[in-house]
Amino acid sequence: MLIIETLPLLRQHIRRLRQEGKRVALVPTMGNLHDGHMKLVDEAKARADVVIVSIFVNPMQFDRPDDLVRYPRTLQEDCEKLNKRKVDYVFAPAVEEIYPQGLEGQTYVDVPGLSTMLEGTSRPGHFRGVSTIVSKLFNLIQPDIACFGEKDFQQLALIRKMVADMGYDIEIVGVPIIRAKDGLALSSRNAYLTAEQRKIAPGLYNVMNSIAEKLIAGNRELQEIIAIAEQELNEKGFRADDIQIRDADTLLELTETSKRAVILAAAWLGQARLIDNQSVTLAQ
């Protein structure tokens, strides 16, 4: 496994891979890798000749400076995990390598609509940062495939739209959420939880299951369902942030013709903002 930190070296290897006709898969990450990331790697390995994992804590997508500062950085441990998984390349650039002129005046990619709705409302600029860095990685690495987790449901939808709109010839693969045995979705931010909070954390998944059961049963009183769910979260020790029930295919409000719903949930537990989602097939 080769660790690449500079753009010239990356370009050199990408040119060689292209000349050899290799099928390349990219797994973009911000590091602090867990089993969910490893599932992305496994999916990439099954679909391509060469797997490149990027590790870059992207300052452009953080809406709070304190969150950027304390985001876990575990490059050595990450590389050890990826080496055991027989990843071919790790691209781990410094911020100065990606944004040599700094963030001020940086050209960016903005996906209208999806960037400012739902999660984008409470995190202004976040999705613009995501689409910009992903676009930059696509331009640099020129992958045939890119793998993303379905835990970040809105992010995946945004990237799919960006790829379609920008004409990228890249297959976007969504990989299902990996959960702990108690249902908690694996996330790098779970590291912020204390031992006591970790015991409480699966409550978010349980509340989503309760919402799903109501939707499957035909209940469409969405405001009431959401209000009850927020109350349940607060009673469990969370601070409910945002719960939405949307059309899974458009992320717009549910209509009578919606075939699938997605429950999008975000809640604070101590210093950790946990997000999760669950899709439900609706009775027609």
UniProtKB/Swiss-Prot annotation:
It is an enzyme of class 6 (ligase). The active site is at H37 (proton donor). Pfam families: Pantoate_ligase (PF02569). InterPro entries: Cyt_trans-like, Pantoate_ligase, Pantoate_ligase_C, Rossmann-like_a/b/a_fold. ATP binds at residues 30-37, 149-152, 178, 186-189. Catalyzes the condensation of pantoate with beta-alanine in an ATP-dependent reaction via a pantoyl-adenylate intermediate. Belongs to the pantothenate synthetase family. Homodimer. PANTHER family: CYTIDYLATE KINASE/PANTOATE-BETA-ALANINE LIGASE (PTHR21299), PANTOATE--BETA-ALANINE LIGASE (PTHR21299:SF1). This is Pantothenate synthetase. It comes from Salmonella typhi.
